[in-house]
Amino acid sequence: MRLLIEQPRTMSSGSSNFLLVPIPEYPVLDCVPNKNVKIVVLGASNVGKTALIVRFLTKRFIGDYEANTGALYSRKINLDGEQVSLQVQDTPCVSLQDDADGLYCQEQINRSIYWADGYVLVFSITDLNSYRTIQPLYQHVRRIHPSGNIPVIIVGNKSDLLRARQVSDPEGKALADELGGLYFEASARENHESVQAAFLHLCQEVSRALGGGNGEKRKGGLHLARPKSPNMQELKRRFRQVLSSKVKSATAL
């Protein structure tokens, strides 16, 4: 059984780098000049990628999400005493395939991997198959970024569901050690602190990796624009919609 991800198309003759369809420009008026941290969250279906992002950015947990939206969220954060512009890219799921060769996911995921500076690889501790996607997914990231160290963390989400656990804490740590990152068990539902610790650690790793540069990578001479963001107003709108529907349901009872 292997992960199947659609392989990125290569650039025109004369270059061996991956060519990913240009990402639409995103308004930069609110960005902190020369201090940009770009993170992508990757993993299988139903592991809680969006829930982790929302929990980190808003401290709230929303149980209902539109699946596989692939939205990018942007906000300013304080990191080691400095204000930086953080962009967190949500992604559709990757999946295990029994009878296919290679790795499958939408081209959007390949673009996001190419664009990002740091990587959150997420599985659910209640889903062994989601855990098994992490190593081949990391290997795919390395194929897109073959040189140098890449900041990466492994997050075992849904740590509140201990009775349904299929992946032990030592197994998560062993995998993270093998891939050269840190392992965090987290609960998007019940523990904001665990989620915050994971994301802030990665932000610090990315900031150090950028080494005081301008935060904009040049890959093979190709400058990648920022993805379009629904911004925090859109995130708040979704939260109000979910809250309103729950209030109406309670009133109807």
From Swiss-Prot:
It is found in: Nucleus, Nucleolus. PANTHER family: RAS-LIKE FAMILY MEMBER 11. CDD domains: RERG_RasL11_like. GTP binds at residues 43-50, 90-97, 157-160. InterPro entries: P-loop_NTPase, Ras-related_GTPase, Small_GTP-bd, Small_GTPase. Residues 213-233 are annotated as: Disordered. One of its GO terms (cellular component) is nucleolus. NCBIfam families: small_GTP. Disulfide bonds: none annotated. Its EC number is 3.6.5.2. This is Ras-like protein family member 11A-like. It catalyses: GTP + H2O = GDP + phosphate + H(+). The lineage of its organism: Eukaryota, Metazoa, Chordata, Craniata, Vertebrata. Pfam families: Ras (PF00071).
